[in-house]
Amino acid sequence: MDVWKRQRLQECRELCPLPALMSLSNILSNTEIIYVKYLFKMDFSTMYRFILPALTLSMTVTKSVVIEMLFILKRWEEINQFFRLNIRKVNDCFVVAQFTNIPVKRKIIVLLYMLTSRQEKQLFLNMIYAFLEKSHLRLGDDEEQNAIRFFSYVDELHLTRDVLLEIIYKLKNTEINQTMELLLSYNELAG
């Protein structure tokens, strides 16, 4: 490995709490870690400057990893600039939706959660629990702890397409509605 690649690899490791080049693909399969540890705590724009040039250094950091992270963060301009995919176009949104290893049902729930504002998060979670008659789960003031509880609970959810659409409708958020309708139309959820 030449000097430039060694320096870039070292810079990336110093920026990340985990060695990003070795871990990102595995982290993506563990949703609570990627969203709680990375998106809630890190300066993503700083980290991102080092991830793109590092794509050639390791097969574990792929284009799909970067697109997925940018999509969750609503960084439409960067997706368009680096990957020539306009998230506001239906066909391009379908392409972006394919860049993920997260199961479709779980991904849509996670996307919906991340797209909501701080005020909407508790409403969103409470609606899910109400639908499932499991509202005994109590949320606190710590957003990170709420997220950990939420993601640990996601796999137990048995949400149908109709229930998700009802949740989306009740949030009355145009951006969420448009994004989720595209994803739902692209990939049917199993009831």
Curated annotation (Swiss-Prot):
One of its GO terms (cellular component) is membrane. It comes from the Viruses. InterPro entries: Herpes_U15 (IPR008644). It holds the Pfam family Herpes_U15. The chain crosses the membrane at residues 50-72. The keyword Transmembrane applies. Keywords: Host membrane, Membrane, Transmembrane, Transmembrane helix. This is Protein U15. It is a single-pass membrane protein. The keyword RNA-binding does not apply. It is found in: Host membrane.
